[in-house]
């Protein structure tokens, strides 16, 4: 098994755009002119999403044409309109005779409390991200959907750290599996291979880690003021051939990567979601791909916080 660039996959382009001053942005995943089968698994209690019904096994559509990861919470769902315009202009979408309708799914994270709550990803920003995908401008760190991402918010924004978007991909023989994830978790972030905490809840000194899980366990009383501005959203890619029902299972297995790297995870204050996409025709075991999906997702989460830069008054791993 060897690490490969996330750009190694055929039929995949990733572009990003952001408004750094406003603390928000979007990441667009384009899935080729013919689209690709995709599945979705949602574990968080507060998702903001678009066209997720398309990915259910009983839905008629067998492929989608793009996935958008964005900030802006539900306001940011406007961004998909820009992706649809970009794809329609290029004749990409589901043929309905008079035009082609691009099938674009989207999940958003909450970054409204970071800088400017009234500036969010919109159609223009997402269209720009599509144009950027042509030149492959994807970068890990505080870009795209990760622009306003933060982690460790059990005690609110005053004790959190800056996060971002991260990627990781591997190849085993002809099989490729990779992940891109925007990490905006309530919980803390860990290197699952060493058990070391990498980022998360900070004490009043702004440098010492506190343990979010231990703090949460100090009282079983219902917390009415739990900070709700969270959500980790990601995509697993593989060049193996699967239909969307199997991809839903692979996405579910990839959620184990969230559980390895984020503690606590899948809370009612998160909207944790993972897409899984098939980009090729390699014959591979579904469970092997799912297990690799969990591995690359956990590694991508770690990379998201390691690549982030301090911003908006929030420290990052690089500044501790």
Please tell me what each predicted stretch does:
Residues 1-74, 78-81, 89-320:
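A structural signal for small-residue-enriched, beta-sheet-centric alpha/beta enzyme cores
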Residues 84:
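Acidic/His-rich segments in extracytoplasmic proteins that coordinate ligands and/or metal ions
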């Amino acid at each position: 098994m060897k690490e490969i660039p996330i750009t190694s996959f055929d039929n995949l382009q990733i572009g990003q755009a952001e408004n750094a001053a406003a603390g928000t942005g979007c990441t667009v995943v384009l899935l080729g002119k013919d689209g690709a089968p995709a599945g979705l698994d949602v574990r968080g209690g507060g998702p903001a999403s678009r066209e997720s019904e398309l990915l259910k096994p009983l839905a008629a559509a067998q492929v989608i044409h793009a996935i958008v990861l964005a900030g802006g919470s539900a306001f940011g769902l406007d961004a998909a309109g820009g992706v649809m315009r970009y794809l329609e202009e290029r004749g990409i979408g589901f043929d309905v005779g008079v035009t082609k309708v691009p099938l674009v799914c989207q999940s958003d994270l909450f970054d409204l409390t970071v800088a400017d709550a009234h500036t969010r990803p919109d159609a223009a920003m997402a269209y720009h991200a599509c144009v950027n995908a042509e030149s492959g401008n994807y970068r890990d760190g505080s870009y795209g959907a990760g622009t306003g991402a933060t982690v460790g918010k059990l005690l609110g924004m005053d004790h959190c750290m800056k996060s971002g978007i991260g990627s990781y991909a591997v190849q085993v023989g002809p099989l490729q599996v990779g992940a891109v994830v925007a990490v905006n978790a309530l919980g803390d972030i860990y290197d699952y291979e060493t058990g070391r905490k990498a980022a998360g809840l900070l004490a009043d000194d702004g440098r010492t880690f506190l343990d979010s899980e231990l703090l949460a366990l100090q009282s079983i009383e219902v917390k009415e003021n739990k900070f709700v501005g969270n959500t980790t959203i990601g995509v697993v890619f593989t060049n193996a051939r699967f239909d969307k029902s199997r991809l839903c299972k692979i996405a579910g297995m990839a959620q184990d990567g969230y559980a390895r790297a984020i503690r606590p995870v899948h809370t009612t204050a998160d909207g944790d979601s993972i897409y899984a996409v098939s980009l090729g025709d390699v014959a591979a075991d579904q469970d092997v791909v799912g297990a690799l999906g969990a591995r690359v997702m956990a590694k991508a989460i770690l990379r998201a916080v390691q690549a982030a830069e301090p911003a908006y008054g929030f420290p990052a791993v690089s500044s501790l």
